[in-house]
Regions:
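Active-site-adjacent mobile loop/cap segments within catalytic or ligand-binding domains
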Residues: 208-261
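N-terminal, intrinsically disordered, polar/charged segments of Gram-positive cell-envelope systems
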Residues: 18-57, 65-68, 76-79
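Active-site-adjacent substrate-binding region
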Residues: 184-210
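Solvent-exposed loop/turn segments at secondary-structure junctions
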Residues: 63-66, 112-116, 152-157, 179-182, ...
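Active-site histidine-acidic residue metal-binding/catalytic motifs
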Residues: 51-122
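Hydrophobic membrane-insertion alpha-helices, especially the h-region
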Residues: 7-23
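Second-shell loop/turn segments in exported
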Residues: 77-86, 95, 117-126, 175-184, ...
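Active-site microenvironments of hydrolase-like enzyme catalytic domains
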Residues: 134-177
Length: 261
């Protein structure tokens, strides 16, 4: 009988043991819990996300240069080659976004340089002098891997438009002034980029136009940096869609060029 009582008491103790232990005064015992990772909180790096490591400065010396189809679509006005709002300067955000997509930080000189040139009482031919101050100040304050002065060519559609695979693009041309000591660097840079663009979309670049002599600038502020380019982005007849497609090709080519250096 005593053995049976001991056995029953033993079973009772086994049953009560977890309850007794749970009531013992261990530090913060009542707050102990198992931390289970929440799968929804896990963040994975996207393979498409590229952290910017290169910097590009964008300038628009002739900021009022306009594209006829864009002006007509947005204002109803036809045959307009210059506009104070609907112009190449208004494309800067689109260009910055395409550079960003390629992992390149692009910064525009956020000044309407054509308006500034007029405010200073200067003629159209003096626009590069006006732009020079702003470009030089930026280069002095920050370091850029590339400086681009964007323009719109005055050439017509036949010269500035490419149709490839049923898709139309605005052609680009690179202008290099030969009347300064660093022009060989600018020329080499322009030729490399032109070649890369044509490898991506054959014929999209019209090549490099060399400028010197009378009635041309001959420098185009390219003496400020050996990594400075002047790019004619399409012509007066190119559409916004054509310019957008070309901007995607241009920024991809620039990304390849910067990565190779």
């Amino acid at each position: 009988m005593n053995n049976i009582k001991r056995f029953l008491l033993f079973l009772l103790l086994l049953f009560l043991m977890p309850i007794i232990i749970g009531q013992l005064p261990f530090p913060n015992n009542e707050h102990l819990s198992v931390q289970v990772p929440n799968e929804q909180q896990l963040v994975y790096a996207s393979s498409n996300l590229v952290m910017p490591s290169k910097r590009v400065l964008l300038a628009f010396t002739h900021s009022h240069e306009a594209y006829r189809p864009i002006v007509e679509a947005k204002s109803g006005k036809k045959q307009v080659d210059s506009h104070n709002k609907i112009n190449i300067f208004s494309l800067r955000q689109m260009l910055e976004e395409y550079f960003s997509f390629q992992g390149i930080e692009a910064e525009s000189i956020d000044v309407d340089l054509a308006a500034e040139n007029q405010a200073q009482g200067r003629s159209h031919s003096q626009a590069y002098k006006t732009a020079r101050t702003f470009i030089a100040d930026k280069i002095a304050m920050d370091q850029y891997d590339l400086v681009i002065d964007f323009h719109r060519d005055s050439a017509r559609k036949k010269t500035t438009t490419l149709t490839e695979g049923g898709v139309s693009y605005a052609k680009v041309a690179f202008v290099v002034g030969l009347e300064h000591p660093m022009h060989t660097w600018n020329l080499s840079y322009a030729e490399q980029l032109s070649q890369l663009m044509n490898e991506l979309v054959p014929g999209i670049s019209r090549g490099v136009i060399k400028k010197e002599g009378e009635r041309v600038d001959g420098i185009y502020n390219q003496d400020l940096s050996k990594e400075m380019l002047l790019i004619e982005l399409g012509g007066i007849d190119n559409t916004e869609e054509e310019l957008t497609r070309t901007s995607a090709v241009l920024t991809e080519a620039i990304s390849k060029l910067l990565d190779s250096q």
